[in-house]
Amino acid sequence: MAEADTERRPHIPVLLRPLLAAVAPVEGTWLDGTFGAGGYARGLLEAGADRVIGVDRDPLALKMASGWAGDYGDRLRLVAGTFSQLDSHAGAPLDGVVLDLGVSSMQLDLAERGFSFQKDGPLDMRMSQEGESAADLVNTASEETLADILYHYGEERASRRIARAIVEARAAAPITRTLALAEIVARCLPRPKPGQMHPATRSFQAIRIAVNAEFSELVEGLEAAERALRPGGRLAVVTFHSLEDRIVKRFLQLRSGGEGQGNRYAPETRADAPRFTLPLRRAISPDEAELAENPRARSARLRVGVRTDAPAGKVDPQALGTPLIPKKGRR
């Protein structure tokens, strides 16, 4: 089951110290594809990176960084965009790429962004503040599509029951507020015991992932990193729930030689050669000291790959275990 990821984002970067240790030495040009509050970018600069390109699709994140980004001069360049196109933002081969997936603390903490089920705000959830909002999706998608989204993107077992309740509620009045949706979901599930996650956790995660096309963005971003990194360049990805971690884990497994050739006796070609090596035997999790300081880090996982000189290529999203919504009945 996917871990709760809606109460997870600290302003202090998660796993920063082990990340810097795993990718050392930090030098050359790095790209932070999920700039957010800039914690990883600053950490990379202070650890020795010559230059960092900070990319974020949230215009508010870049606006909030304007007050301090100038302190680094031309060592820090901010770019409005998505990390699925990070190779075009780079302009030249990179020495490293960092991706910190999912929703940020800033997005969760601002009620007006509509990500939180604990604060009343407009039902928005758009990271880029453009395109279809969560309210648009919740009020127009078919019951079947809503159930598929909740099940595949949130691993919500009560997906059919919740989808039916949403459709019944919106027939009376449009669902436009976060707490209104959270209440509809909560009524479909048992009251949680002390210490258990909020009943709306999985549903909010699923809707957010759908609104922001997070899984397709992730797969395309991993491919873009493979294209952008020079031989020896490092890819570091921090995940926060099992669905996205599975995609990253499988990508690195496959690209490090785990594709499984049809004939093991056939000569290896350049196209078959591993694109990454794996310096870590397994994912790194926060230690007790970090969890004591920052409980939101509890589900974080860090995975690292080192680029080889093999040519980049495309990857099949299904081979990565990417959850896919059936096309039938999407609207």
Swiss-Prot record:
SUPFAM superfamilies: Putative methyltransferase TM0872, insert domain (SSF81799), S-adenosyl-L-methionine-dependent methyltransferases (SSF53335)
Cysteines paired by S-S bonds: none
Keyword check for Cytoplasm: yes
Any one cellular-component term (Gene Ontology): cytoplasm
Keyword field contains Kinase: no
EC number: 2.1.1.199
Binding site for S-adenosyl-L-methionine: G38, G39, Y40, D56, F83, D100, Q107
Keyword annotations: Cytoplasm, Methyltransferase, rRNA processing, S-adenosyl-L-methionine, Transferase
Reaction it catalyzes: cytidine(1402) in 16S rRNA + S-adenosyl-L-methionine = N(4)-methylcytidine(1402) in 16S rRNA + S-adenosyl-L-homocysteine + H(+)
Domain of life where this protein originates: Bacteria
GO terms under biological process: rRNA base methylation
Family the entry assigns: Belongs to the methyltransferase superfamily. RsmH family.
Function: Specifically methylates the N4 position of cytidine in position 1402 (C1402) of 16S rRNA.
Name of the protein this chain belongs to: Ribosomal RNA small subunit methyltransferase H
Protein's organism: Cereibacter sphaeroides (strain ATCC 17023 / DSM 158 / JCM 6121 / CCUG 31486 / LMG 2827 / NBRC 12203 / NCIMB 8253 / ATH 2.4.1.)
